[in-house]
Amino acid sequence: MSAPQDRTDDGGVPVPVTPAGATGGAPAELPPSSPAGRGMFGDQGTGDVSGYGGLVRPQRSIEAATRPYGGYFDEVADALEEAYPAFGEAIEKVVVDRGELTLHIRPERIAEVCQVMRDDLSLRFELCSSVSGVDYLGADACRLHVVYQLTSMTYRRQVRLEAAVSAENPHLPSVTSVYPTADWQERETYDMFGVIFDGHPGLTRILMPDDWEGHPQRKDYPLGGVPVEYKGAEIPPPDRRRSYQ
């Protein structure tokens, strides 16, 4: 498949296809770092990082982008705003980072936005290739984020949608009626993170047993273990240092 060619606007001025910040496959310049995090996953406990090899990682602060976003990103935003009357209320912020576009959506609006993204002729995001969860423990009240990767095979474009809910009220509308491919992926996100997708046709666990307690990829989920025997020697279960509490 040949590389996409630059287009021109109505005045004949070339408009680059490559989004702003992208540098021919290399990541765009990173935003400023906030104070470094120590340990793993924002552990706020004793500060004992011996189990992680003394890992120290920078924490980046990603701010909302301003116009122009660059390339087709502005076209996508304009088309969605024109096709969806509740655009101003539904879109919490727009982020352009490392040459990728992410639209942060109010949780109750996610299914509506997906419907417009799929059906509008100027958008045509026919495929939801991924639904996944992220736990930003300690970041804010809405720590559970669900990420939707949308692809337009018509226009060869990709956009990411993201919605955030709290651990106390982890409800999101299911998008399975719009994207059937989201069925098992929503089940996995429910299983691992405890996000409840209202309207899903069969929201049951998909990896863990039905009677399993808790959601293993939440960062406040304690590690456990069972004793294992090796050649007559009994190895005790691991400690619970990574309980993230």
From Swiss-Prot:
This is NADH-quinone oxidoreductase subunit C. The lineage of its organism: Bacteria, Bacillati, Actinomycetota, Actinomycetes, Micromonosporales. Keywords: Cell membrane, Membrane, NAD, Quinone, Translocase, Transport. It comes from Salinispora tropica (strain ATCC BAA-916 / DSM 44818 / JCM 13857 / NBRC 105044 / CNB-440). It is an enzyme of class 7 (translocase). It catalyses: a quinone + NADH + 5 H(+)(in) = a quinol + NAD(+) + 4 H(+)(out). It is a peripheral membrane protein. HAMAP family: NDH1_NuoC. The gene is nuoC. Residues 11-28 have a biased composition (Low complexity).
